[in-house]
């Protein structure tokens, strides 16, 4: 099963991705993990990403797309994956469709975790990270609404919304039900 997870920052996508990956028997693919792995292994893509990150810039989509393409073509992803943190934009979604099309494959589902903004702010402030101030969190929410929410229309027909409020296991049960599991 090939699944993309969407939702605002702090919606619990990373937590749910790990659980879904275990229950579906497919790898959890996170762009953050891909960046770290490529950088620590000093791959050509890792070195390219590092240059941007060192300058405080976002890693360009073409670099991210190539990392994702390499990862979804690894043997452990032959039967599917849970993608977390990608795609973030419609351009990245188009790139993913091409990558999967080249593999004679396509997405099975897009889960969108729905969490009210005030709940997101509370959750992220409770994590106690230095860079998680309320202003920063609300700005990340704005960026999500502007750049990532348009994916909901792009993936019309594949999107299943999941109530992301509640205990981790409750949300996971809802996510599995949404996938028909």
Curated annotation (Swiss-Prot):
Which GO BP terms apply?
AMP salvage
Name the catalysed reactions.
AMP + ATP = 2 ADP
Membrane-traversing stretches: none
Binding residues annotated for AMP, in chain numbering? 31, 36, 57-59, 85-88, 92, 129, 140
Catalytic EC class: transferase
Its main subcellular localisation, reduced to a broad class, is: cytoplasm
- Which Gene Ontology molecular function entries are recorded, alphabetically? adenylate kinase activity; ATP binding
* Pfam families, per database record: ADK (PF00406)
The answer to whether UniProt assigns keyword Zinc to this entry is no
PROSITE patterns in alphabetical order: ADENYLATE_KINASE
Question: Which UniProt keywords are listed?
Answer: ATP-binding, Cytoplasm, Kinase, Nucleotide biosynthesis, Nucleotide-binding, Transferase
Task: Give the function comment from the record.
Answer: Catalyzes the reversible transfer of the terminal phosphate group between ATP and AMP. Plays an important role in cellular energy homeostasis and in adenine nucleotide metabolism.
Record's comment describing the protein's domains = Consists of three domains, a large central CORE domain and two small peripheral domains, NMPbind and LID, which undergo movements during catalysis. The LID domain closes over the site of phosphoryl transfer upon ATP binding. Assembling and dissambling the active center during each catalytic cycle provides an effective means to prevent ATP hydrolysis.
Concerning its family, UniProt says: Belongs to the adenylate kinase family.
Q: How is the quaternary structure described?
A: Monomer.
Protein name as catalogued:
Adenylate kinase
> Which organism does this record belong to?
Nocardia farcinica (strain IFM 10152)
**Gene transcribed to yield this protein:** adk
